[in-house]
């Protein structure tokens, strides 16, 4: 029975081999290749990139030649220490010269100059804080006397430069001028205070003077003189009465003013009286009277 079943069943169909053209058509239909660029364009792109890289490398080499660890040929500045070199390369003047250099060579400047030029075989000392610099936390760092001179409006790159400035002639001259101005201002303020104090004392004394004047006016006596007491010359001291008037006992004449009394002394009447009195005195001395 088993043999008959095998004989009755038809043989399985074998897949017919497809022609080679159909395989080619199927592969081209499923796989799409990108369009190929011309040969001239493919060759031009790597050449342009190589030219830019070579140009940038040449400029970096030239910049390294210009910016030595202790001499900046770009700014024509000789540096004494690594601290001064770092301060110079991070300063405004060097940054300006560096931007001009890159603008002339039509190449963008690097992000940091300190990565390009570094002092060789020298310990790096932290740069003193400059005026107006900020930390990442937003804290303001105030400048010290080794960084900035407020009197001369000058900033320093190192303590040695600051010490040389403070010992120079320009700083000494400005210091003398500032001291002279401060002394003159203090003297003027003291003079103003003294004047105000004096005026205040005089103002306080004015009521006392007024009271004294009213007491004198109200007082009555034999020697009361309502006029202000005038200055009496020495030669007329014997001719002044207690009331303040001038009196000539020889002529029995009085005068209220000094000029009037002097005119009386120069008059003929007074001179004749004086001559008569002198003659009488002489005769009395001789014993004729």
Curated annotation (Swiss-Prot):
Residues 24-33, 180-191 have a biased composition (Polar residues). InterPro entries: Matrin/U1-like-C_Znf_C2H2 (IPR003604), ZMAT3 (IPR052644), Znf_C2H2_jaz (IPR022755), Znf_C2H2_sf (IPR036236), Znf_C2H2_type (IPR013087). This is Zinc finger matrin-type protein 3. Residues 9-20 have a biased composition (Pro residues). Induction: By DNA damage in a p53/TP53-dependent manner. Up-regulated following ionizing radiation in primary squamous cell carcinoma of the lung and in various colon cancer cell lines. The gene is ZMAT3. It comes from Homo sapiens. Highly expressed in adult brain, and moderately in adult kidney and testis. Not detected in fetal brain, heart, pancreas, adrenal gland, liver or small intestine. Acts as a bona fide target gene of p53/TP53. May play a role in the TP53-dependent growth regulatory pathway. May contribute to TP53-mediated apoptosis by regulation of TP53 expression and translocation to the nucleus and nucleolus.
């Amino acid at each position: 029975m088993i043999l008959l079943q095998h004989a009755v069943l038809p043989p399985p169909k074998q897949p017919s081999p497809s022609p080679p053209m159909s395989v080619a058509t199927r592969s081209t239909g499923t796989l799409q290749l990108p369009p190929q660029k011309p040969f001239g364009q493919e060759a031009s792109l790597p050449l342009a990139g190589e030219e830019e890289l070579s140009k940038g490398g040449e400029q970096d080499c030239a910049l390294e030649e210009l910016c030595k660890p202790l001499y900046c040929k770009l700014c024509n500045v000789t540096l004494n220490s690594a601290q001064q070199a770092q301060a110079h390369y991070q300063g405004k003047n060097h940054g300006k010269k560096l931007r001009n250099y890159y603008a002339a060579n039509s190449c963008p400047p690097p992000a940091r100059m300190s990565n390009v030029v570094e002092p060789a075989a020298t310990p790096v000392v932290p740069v003193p804080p400059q005026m107006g610099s900020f930390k990442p936390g937003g804290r303001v760092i105030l400048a010290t006397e080794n960084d900035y001179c407020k009197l001369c409006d000058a900033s320093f790159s190192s303590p040695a430069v600051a010490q040389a400035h403070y010992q120079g002639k320009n700083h000494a001259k400005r210091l003398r001028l500032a001291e002279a101005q401060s002394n003159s201002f203090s003297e003027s303020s003291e003079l103003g205070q003294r004047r105000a104090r004096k005026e205040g004392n005089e103002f306080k004394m004015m009521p006392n003077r007024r009271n004294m004047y009213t007491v004198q006016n109200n007082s009555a006596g034999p020697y009361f003189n309502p006029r202000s007491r005038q200055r009496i010359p020495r030669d007329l001291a014997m001719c002044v009465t207690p009331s303040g008037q001038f009196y000539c006992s020889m002529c029995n004449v009085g005068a209220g003013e000094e000029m009037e009394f002097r005119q009386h002394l120069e008059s003929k009447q007074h001179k004749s009286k004086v001559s008569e009195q002198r003659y009488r005195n002489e005769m009395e001395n001789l014993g004729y009277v």
